[in-house]
Amino acid sequence: MIRLYTAKTPNGYKATIALEELALQYSVHHVDISKAERPEDFLAASPNNKIPAIVDESNPADPISIFESGAILVYLAEKTGKLLPPSGRARAETMAWTFWQVGNTGPMLGQLGFFAMRAPEKIPFAIQRYVDESARLLKVMDQRLDANEYLGGADYSIADIMNYTWIAAAQGYLKEQLGAYFQDKPSLNRWLEVVGARPAVKKGLTIPE
């Protein structure tokens, strides 16, 4: 059994989608990220005090705690032998696009969301800076998907899960800032539709309730 600490965020949904795709048994522990105080068992699993985090209790004598969404998805994929090619070019490209998300779409879209929607003061320069960079990243993805069915190549993988949750969220919540940049991205929109139609993705986006 895997213990999952999560919340309703793009990073949290990465873990629930992966767990659903891999048909792993897990229990959900909803972390209220609006509160400063967090449960001690969560902090033990996530020293950075961020969701998601998991504790793999398959071996009760030696449970394994993992934090950071990219590390979690790689661990789960390697544990099951699914969603991550074992070697060669396919693995290298899947890993590259997995961690491209960690360093690019997550931080840029997250900052755009903060400055456009939550910052107490609107700073036009900051908003435009993150709009421009986010638009560039959408173009990078569209170009990749022009030549490949999925981000890692021919097969659906953790790279798609990692990126999908953020791109789908941006398409919905940042429509005012980025809507126009989705309109001329046929391959990106095709990928969004295909990934979004997967049963595990649909279910993962409902957890926690």
What are the language-model segments listed below?
Residues 1-3, 193, 209:
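Basic/polar N-terminal segments that are highly enriched at the extreme N-terminus
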Residues 76, 98-197:
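GST-like fold's C-terminal all-alpha helical module
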Residues 194, 201-204:
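Charged phosphate-binding loop/patch that engages nucleotide di/tri-phosphates or the phosphate backbone
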Residues 44, 197, 206-207:
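Phosphate-coordinating loops and pocket residues in cytosolic domains that bind phosphorylated ligands
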Residues 110-111, 206-208:
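Short coil/turn segments at secondary-structure boundaries
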Residues 1-128:
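GST-like domain detector, emphasizing the conserved glutathione-binding G-site
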